[in-house]
């Protein structure tokens, strides 16, 4: 008889873990507290009827590039990736926009004087993506499978974005690099902030920054559908208060952050391990707004209409100042804003002729400050008349994010700070294993961290199976 396992949380990592266990022949139930599976990968009507908004994640470079997701027949279960003509636009105050094109050579040409430097930064990893992705989307190995490639990445990754940006001569290229680095939620003068910039750029050139047709829920639904073919079950509206109440299961994989794991694991976890989890640090938060629009955003630069993702923040120096303020517990007067406009490329997101947009800025964890005016001022700066396009808006504060997904602690959408210490010990030196032999953690608080890629769940499940002698 196959062993019965339980995955707590039906986010992408929980579903990935469940699929790995089911593929190994285990019985799997996935228990999800919310009425809809997906965690932060859900699509909901948040403004007006007929307008579909991604609650959390919206653009999926690491989803499309995930070694595990790529191994699954998700297209047979309804997943369709849509690529905008350009992955990213970064408008500037002169009315032009710096474009990150899918084609690396085209991007190098557009960056002119910085084209060669851009190529040196990213080309080795773009050309060897099939080797690079499994390395970067997993726990740090003492001896990498591709040591030369990873040594080259490490030489850049351990630096700050500020340091690496000194190689770039044009303010336009430096601005582009700053926006990419800001995905780290770190100050741009901190170690590892360069790693995020390079990874985001590499993924754009290697696999693109696609959106799922119909929204992030389509990825979730495809994962659930495939899991069902393996006889796995997803049971929604089933919050778990304590593992002691789940006596029918022999193995637990928890798509939970350390704070929730302490509560759910209770006395099943050793006191010393609970203490380690208790010292885990959460990062800056997102202040998010969803928009129903009567037309496309009126960008000064029409190039912005070619990209599903737009970075709003101006120069490197301005973005660096904004991120440094947030990291110091302050609120920026000119915040870096990340905006997506999926309905330009996926007409299923809004009624005919109408559009949706999604934008957030960074704020300190747990912030209660209303950043709506400052966020919209940044959009208006590069798209005058934007406010006149708004039919309805839904503000989602950090506390709202957490209430809609308990893993988004204080509004942290990345599963915890990714500074050097917490990068190495995420969430502890054990990574996926806990002090209990039958309990594992598989959330974004484990390697490789945030992003929708399922690799935290994949590696956690593989670790659990190895401990059972099934690998």
Show where each model-derived region lies.
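A conserved FAD-binding loop/helix module that cradles the flavin
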Residues: 442-468
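A glycine-rich dinucleotide-binding beta-alpha-beta segment and adjacent secondary-structure elements
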Residues: 174-187, 333-338, 385-447
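Mid-domain catalytic core of redox enzymes
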Residues: 238-350
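N-terminal glycine-rich phosphate/pyrophosphate-binding loop and immediately adjacent elements
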Residues: 3-130, 417
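Extreme N-terminal leader/targeting segments of oxidoreductases
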Residues: 1-6, 23-24, 204, 420-426, ...
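Rossmann-like flavin
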Residues: 93-192
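Glycine-rich phosphate/pyrophosphate-binding beta-alpha loops
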Residues: 57-62, 182-186, 286-288, 345-346, ...
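Helical element adjacent to the flavin cofactor pocket in flavoenzyme catalytic cores
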Residues: 199-244
